[in-house]
Structures are given as structure tokens and as C-alpha cells.
């Protein structure tokens, strides 16, 4: 891979972070629950409001990075430490997205549902760009891969288990912090879990060839 192509891929990855963060902001603005992987940070941001959602996402991502190190130990590749600054960038993008959302009304249930669906599409678009960039995984996906490698289990199955675990942790935190009330986990969480993968596959099919041409400087064979 040439230096120029590598730079292009990292630029695309940064762009993917922006859209993924914007997708999170849309779903958060809908107040019907966020994606499973963001649900823990979402509940914590609702309880401890002195820190923004973006900041809690940075903290959660760093926890997942530490988890990777503990799982992989000597097999953890130093290049993966790039996840740390990229997590901070993702958090900043999320807070910027929340600022944008402050100008968009979502005061009725239909509008909130629209926010969720738009968020899922935008999030899926961002994830697709990250997949096509193919330079570094986000901390959530990297943690799942580490767990899959250690347990010798299928990545897809581990991803499902991880999403369920995130929701369970968020649910426990919600019950503890909000007097046995479920906060931040709603139909939007379920919709995100079910539909995001479908959206990612759609965008992969549409964008893979044209973006490969841009990244590689020639039409893929």
C-alpha cells in the first residue's frame, strides 16, 4: 500500500467517525434509546450530566481499549493505541452533533422516531466508510474481535453477545441510578440493533467499488 493510499484511507476513516458520531447524536436526540454499544455511555450521561455524552463515550471507548489489552496481552498491537486519540475525536464529533441537534425540533413521538431512523442510516453510513477504509477498527469492534480471537468463537456471534451485554450493563446502571426506572434503553435501541447491520451491508454494496477506485487510484479488479 502506497503512502498516498494510506493517507486517503485514514482521511476516509476520520470522515467515517464524523458520520458515525452524527448518527449517535441523531438517535440520542430522538430520546428513544441509542445503539447497544452507546447505551452504557448514554445512561451515564443522563445521570452524571456534568460530563457530556461525547465525554462518556470517550471514557467507555477507553475502557474497551483497556479490555483489549487485558485480553490480548502481548498480542496487542501498538498500532491499535491509535484508537485512543480517535476515541477522543469521536467524542468531540458526537458533542458537535448534539449541538447541531439543538436546532432540530423533535418534540413529538413521530419526530423522535424519524430522528432514530435517520440516526440509524447515518450511523450505518459511517460504519460502512470505516469498513471500506480498512485501516483501524473502532474500539467496540476491536474489543469484539479480541474476544472472538481469544475464545475462538465466530465474530458475528460474539458481536451479538457483546451488544446484549452492553444493554444489560446499561439496564443495570439505569435501575441503580434512576430508582429502578429504565432510562435510555427503548425501542430505538432495539431498532438500532436490528437495522444498523442491514444499512451497513447496503452502503458497502453501493460504495465499495467507487471508493476503492478513489483510494487505490484505479478501478479494482
What residues fall within each predicted segment?
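Core subunits and conserved enzymes of cellular information-processing
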Residues: 1-221
Amino acid at each position: 500500500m502506497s503512502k498516498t493510499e494510506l493517507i486517503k484511507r485514514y482521511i476516509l476513516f476520520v470522515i467515517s467517525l464524523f458520520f458515525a458520531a452524527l448518527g449517535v447524536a441523531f438517535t440520542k436526540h430522538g430520546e428513544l434509546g441509542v445503539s447497544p454499544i452507546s447505551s452504557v455511555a448514554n445512561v451515564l450521561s443522563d445521570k452524571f450530566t456534568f460530563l457530556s455524552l461525547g465525554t462518556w463515550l470517550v471514557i467507555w471507548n477507553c475502557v474497551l481499549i483497556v479490555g483489549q489489552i487485558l485480553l490480548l496481552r502481548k498480542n496487542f498491537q501498538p498500532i491499535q493505541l491509535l484508537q485512543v486519540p480517535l476515541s477522543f475525536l469521536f467524542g468531540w464529533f458526537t458533542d458537535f452533533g448534539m449541538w447541531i441537534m439543538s436546532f432540530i425540533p423533535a418534540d413529538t413521538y413521530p419526530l423522535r422516531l424519524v430522528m432514530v431512523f435517520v440516526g440509524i442510516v447515518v450511523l450505518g453510513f459511517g460504519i460502512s466508510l470505516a469498513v471500506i477504509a480498512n485501516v483501524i477498527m473502532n474500539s467496540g469492534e476491536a474489543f469484539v474481535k479480541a474476544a472472538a480471537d481469544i475464545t475462538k468463537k465466530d465474530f458475528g456471534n460474539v458481536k451479538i453477545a457483546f451488544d446484549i451485554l452492553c444493554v444489560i450493563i446499561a439496564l443495570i446502571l439505569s435501575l441503580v441510578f434512576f430508582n429502578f426506572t429504565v432510562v435510555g434503553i427503548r425501542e430505538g435501541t432495539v431498532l438500532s440493533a436490528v437495522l444498523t447491520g442491514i444499512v451497513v451491508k447496503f452502503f458497502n454494496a453501493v460504495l465499495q467499488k467507487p471508493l476503492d477506485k478513489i483510494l487505490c487510484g484505479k478501478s479494482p479488479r
